[in-house]
Design a protein with these regions (language model features):
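Acidic catalytic loop of the alpha/beta-hydrolase fold
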Residues: 238-242
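Short beta-strand/loop motif that positions the catalytic acidic residue
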Residues: 227, 233-235
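Catalytic histidine-centered segment of alpha/beta-hydrolase-like enzymes
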Residues: 265-278
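Conserved alpha/beta-hydrolase catalytic His-Asp/Glu region
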Residues: 144-148, 165-225
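Alpha/beta-hydrolase fold catalytic core
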Residues: 1-40, 61-64, 92, 99-104, ...
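Conserved HGGG/HGGXW glycine-rich cap/lid loop of the alpha/beta-hydrolase fold
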Residues: 27-76
C-alpha cells in the first residue's frame, strides 16, 4: 500500500513549519513542536493525525511548549516493521519517543483513544503530568452485545487484505462528511478536506483498522483509579461516538476528575471550536499551578 508522502501529501499540511521527523523505537515519527513554556503533549485519536490540533495547538502554545505527533500506523509516522497498534504497544512506542526527545510533559491532552493512551502511561508511572485533559475520552469498553461484536468486526476487516483499500476507495467527500456527522461533528471545508486526504489513503485506513482490532480497554477502569493528578474531562454534549453520560462513570473512578460539558459540540469538539476547548484547559492549568493567571 502506498504510504502518505510528506513532500507530496503534506505540502500544505497544517502547522507544517513546526514539523520534523524523529527516529525512536523503530519508528520514523512525524512530530510538530511549537511555543515556549512548560511542556505539553497532545495525542490525537484513532484515524486522525497532527492536523486534528491545527486550531488548538497554537492557542495552547501561547503558554506552553506544545508537542504533537502522528500515532504509529497513522498519517506520516512510519515503521520498517509491522507495528504493535494495541494499547500496550502504543504506550511503549510513545515512551520511546518522549525519552528520545527528553520531553517530560506537565500538561497532557488526549482526544478519544489518545486519552486512553495517556491514562495508561500515567497509571504506569511513565508520565507524571500536573494536569491531564481528556477531550471526549474513550476510556470504557463497549458494553453488552457491542463489546464482542465491534472489535470482532474490526478484526475481520483488518485480516481482509482488501478492506483498507475498500475503505480508502469509498472515502469521498460525501462519505467522510457523513461519517463525521455520525459522530456529532460538522467541520469547516478545510477540516473535511484533510480527513478526506487521510481516509483516501489505504495505509492510513489500515493503521486505523488495526488499532481498532487490537484495542482492549478491560484494564482501564482500574487504571483510572491510579491517576493522581488533576483530571479535566471535556465532554461534547453532541458526541455520538462516545456517550456523554460515560463521563460520569469515568469521573467516579478517577480521584481528582471533574467534568466540563461543551454544549453544541460533538466528538471532534477541539476541531469544531478550538477556542472553546482552549479556555477551560487554560483555566485548569492555572488552577494546577502550571502557568500564571495573567
Amino acid at each position: 500500500m502506498r504510504l502518505l508522502d510528506f513532500k507530496r501529501d503534506g505540502a500544505d499540511w497544517p502547522l507544517r513549519e513546526a514539523s520534523r521527523f524523529v527516529a525512536a523505537g523503530g519508528f520514523r515519527w512525524h512530530v510538530q513542536e511549537l511555543g515556549q513554556g512548560p511542556p505539553a503533549l497532545l495525542i490525537h485519536g484513532t484515524a486522525s493525525s497532527t492536523h486534528s490540533w491545527r486550531g488548538l495547538a497554537p492557542l495552547l502554545a501561547r503558554d506552553f511548549r506544545v508537542l504533537t505527533f502522528d500515532l504509529p500506523g497513522h498519517a506520516f509516522t512510519t515503521s520498517q516493521r509491522r507495528p504493535d497498534l494495541s494499547l500496550p504497544g502504543m504506550a511503549e512506542a510513545l515512551t520511546s519517543l518522549v525519552a528520545k526527545l527528553d520531553f517530560a510533559p506537565r500538561l497532557v491532552v488526549g482526544h478519544s483513544a489518545g486519552a486512553a493512551i495517556l491514562a495508561r502511561l500515567i497509571a504506569e508511572g511513565r508520565l507524571a503530568p500536573g494536569l491531564f485533559v481528556a477531550i471526549n475520552g474513550a476510556f470504557l469498553p463497549f458494553e453488552g452485545f457491542a463489546r464482542s461484536v465491534f472489535p470482532a468486526a474490526a478484526r475481520l476487516l483488518f485480516v481482509n487484505p482488501f478492506a483498507a483499500r475498500l475503505f480508502a476507495w469509498k472515502a469521498d467527500r460525501t462519505t467522510v462528511a457523513n461519517m463525521l456527522a455520525g459522530m456529532g461533528t460538522k467541520l469547516d471545508p478545510r477540516g473535511l478536506d484533510l480527513y478526506v486526504r487521510l481516509m483516501s489513503n489505504a495505509a492510513h485506513c489500515g493503521g486505523a483498522l488495526e488499532m481498532m482490532a487490537n484495542w482492549d480497554l478491560s484494564r482501564m477502569p482500574d487504571e483510572l483509579a491510579r491517576i493522581a493528578c488533576p483530571t479535566l474531562l471535556l465532554v461534547g454534549a453532541n458526541d455520538r461516538a462516545i456517550r456523554p453520560e460515560d463521563a460520569r462513570k469515568v469521573a467516579g473512578r478517577t480521584p481528582k476528575a471533574r467534568i466540563e460539558k461543551l454544549q453544541g459540540l460533538g466528538h471532534l469538539a477541539h476541531e469544531e471550536a478550538p477556542e472553546r476547548v482552549a479556555a477551560p484547559i487554560r483555566e485548569a492549568a492555572v488552577a494546577a499551578g502550571l502557568i500564571g493567571g495573567g
